[in-house]
């Protein structure tokens, strides 16, 4: 399912899905391949890419390049999330909540790959609705971006961290 590679610049790369697609033209069908990949540094940075080409390796390469270009930063709390969060993209809905040390990544399919490369080690999660990998990845990354650390909340409100954590 999700194949993993380690890059020289310490980015973890995972291949989530490869799909054969076709374009119908007057003379018949033109086959090509799509690839969905996620890339992360294991420390709160994650991105995804979707590539399409006539050959599988070229599609994977394009997807990896796009993933490296589209990385976002996620606020993590010692390998888990700061608070429960929901994400949605198209028909896919995801829910993630922080978990105690030793719980592990409880997630399925495309969501697991995103969480692992982002550096989340303990989380409880569930995907509802459509389990289309592209939509699940987009919903998961969207939800992770919505996670706010106490420092971010305090700065936005103009208060100290101690005053908001009471």
From Swiss-Prot:
InterPro entries linked to this entry: Ribosomal_Su5_D2-typ_SF (IPR020568), Ribosomal_uS5 (IPR000851), Ribosomal_uS5_bac-type (IPR005712), Ribosomal_uS5_C (IPR005324), Ribosomal_uS5_N (IPR013810), Ribosomal_uS5_N_CS (IPR018192), Ribsml_uS5_D2-typ_fold_subgr (IPR014721)
GO cellular component terms given for this protein: small ribosomal subunit
Q: Does the keyword Ribonucleoprotein apply?
A: yes
* PROSITE patterns per the UniProt record, alphabetical: RIBOSOMAL_S5, S5_DSRBD
What is a biological process (GO) this protein takes part in? translation
Residue ranges annotated as coiled coil are none
One GO MF annotation is: structural constituent of ribosome
Q: Which Pfam families match?
A: Ribosomal_S5 (PF00333), Ribosomal_S5_C (PF03719)
Q: Where is the S5 DRBM domain?
A: 11-74
The function of this protein is: With S4 and S12 plays an important role in translational accuracy.
Print the domain comment field: The N-terminal domain interacts with the head of the 30S subunit; the C-terminal domain interacts with the body and contacts protein S4. The interaction surface between S4 and S5 is involved in control of translational fidelity.
| Binding partners and assembly | Part of the 30S ribosomal subunit. Contacts proteins S4 and S8.
- This chain's protein is named Small ribosomal subunit protein uS5
* UniProt organism field: Vibrio atlanticus (strain LGP32) (Vibrio splendidus (strain Mel32))
Instruction: Give the lineage.
Output: Bacteria, Pseudomonadati, Pseudomonadota, Gammaproteobacteria, Vibrionales
Gene that produces this protein? rpsE
């Amino acid at each position: 399912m999700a194949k993993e590679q380690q890059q020289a610049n310490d980015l973890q790369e995972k291949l989530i899905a490869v799909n054969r697609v076709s374009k119908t033209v007057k003379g018949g069908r033109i086959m090509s391949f799509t690839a969905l990949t996620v890339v992360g540094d294991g420390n709160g940075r994650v991105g995804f890419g979707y590539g399409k080409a006539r050959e599988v390796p070229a599609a994977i390469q394009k997807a990896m390049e796009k993933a490296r270009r589209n990385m976002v930063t996620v606020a993590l709390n010692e390998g888990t999330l700061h608070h429960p969060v929901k994400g949605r993209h198209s028909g896919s809905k995801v829910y993630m909540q922080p978990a105690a040390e030793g719980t592990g990544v409880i997630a399925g399919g495309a969501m697991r790959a995103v969480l692992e490369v982002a550096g989340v080690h303990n989380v409880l999660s569930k995907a509802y609705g459509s389990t289309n990998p592209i939509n699940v990845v987009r919903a998961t990354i969207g939800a992770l971006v919505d996670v706010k650390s106490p420092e971010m909340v305090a700065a936005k409100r103009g208060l100290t961290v101690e005053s908001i954590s009471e």
